[in-house]
Amino acid sequence: MTKEFHHVTVLLHETVDMLDIKPNGIYVDATLGGSGHSAYLLSKLSEQGHLYCFDQDQKAIDNAQVTLKSYIDKGQVTFIKDNFRHLKARLTALGVDEIDGILYDLGVSSPQLDERERGFSYKQDAPLDMRMDRQSLLTAYEVVNTYPFNDLVKIFFKYGEDKFSKQIARKIEQARAIKPIETTTELAELIKAAKPAKELKKKGHPAKQIFQAIRIEVNDELGAADESIQDAMELLALDGRISVITFHSLEDRLTKQLFKEASTVDVPKGLPLIPEDMKPTFELVSRKPILPSHSELTANKRAHSAKLRVAKKIRK
């Protein structure tokens, strides 16, 4: 793995092993990132198997061209530089209308967090950017400096679940009236200034939730995940599986709800037989989310909030 794209893969074996890999199968890594999951999955495929890898970050694909070279040379890998919300259309265009499994590792990859100029981190001074796709137009700068007060409050509450959303939005509104807010440090200091002193003594950085909220807005992360996971569930073959790693409650809630809707049946009480078209199409492989082991948590602090949910298609 190239030094500039160092990424420790979370829940590596659990995520891939629970896909119950068929050596000749067709699989998708919807979030290539540091290519850790892809490399492990490819090690389980025969030369007849194939993996399609999505990422909207060209650096992730460039890195994978090196780390997965032996599989690329055998024609087992296809890279697709795009947001995974376009997964179904892009696969269909390649003649793929059914897959045996897919995995998602949602959120920001370590290299994106560590690359100062990307503007994802409140711990490093950088321009307000936060774009996962460097070619997209909306940046954190636009959100912070142009969104109306009420829109900021809504985003901070909805995506950051921060109870001081109004106070923070007001502080931002006051500051940008004097001059634009240009850097992550400026924004982090404004967030700290908007919170009461006792709040600042609590564990964790006071800007964490607001930075998360802005990042989700800039990249439409939840909208993209919702669309993509639903499309992936449609594409799955019978007995195909989907693994989703989430890192915060909003992603986990979304995944849990989508899996629940597909794996439960809502029929009137007393109905003697469940109509065929009302039967569940999925079953949960694990009733509760799978969490990182103690040893993984010790080795990788970024794994602390990770949760893995897995579902299996039982009816087309």
Curated annotation (Swiss-Prot):
SUPFAM superfamilies noted in UniProt: Putative methyltransferase TM0872, insert domain (SSF81799), S-adenosyl-L-methionine-dependent methyltransferases (SSF53335)
Where can this protein be found?
Cytoplasm
Q: Which of this chain's residues are annotated to bind S-adenosyl-L-methionine?
A: 35-37, 55, 84, 105, 112
Record keyword rRNA processing present: yes
The record, for Pfam families, names: Methyltransf_5 (PF01795)
Report keywords, A-Z: Cytoplasm, Methyltransferase, rRNA processing, S-adenosyl-L-methionine, Transferase
BP terms from Gene Ontology: rRNA base methylation
Which InterPro entries does the record match to this protein? RsmH, SAM-dep_MeTrfase_MraW_recog, SAM-dependent_MTases_sf
- The record's top EC class is transferase
EC number annotated for this UniProt entry: 2.1.1.199
Domain of life here? Bacteria
Does the keyword RNA-binding belong to this entry? no
What catalytic activity is recorded? cytidine(1402) in 16S rRNA + S-adenosyl-L-methionine = N(4)-methylcytidine(1402) in 16S rRNA + S-adenosyl-L-homocysteine + H(+)
Give a GO molecular function annotation for the protein.
Answer: rRNA (cytosine-N4-)-methyltransferase activity
A cellular component term from Gene Ontology for this protein is: cytoplasm
What role is this protein assigned?
Specifically methylates the N4 position of cytidine in position 1402 (C1402) of 16S rRNA.
The record's comment on protein family reads:
Belongs to the methyltransferase superfamily. RsmH family.
Q: What is this protein called?
A: Ribosomal RNA small subunit methyltransferase H
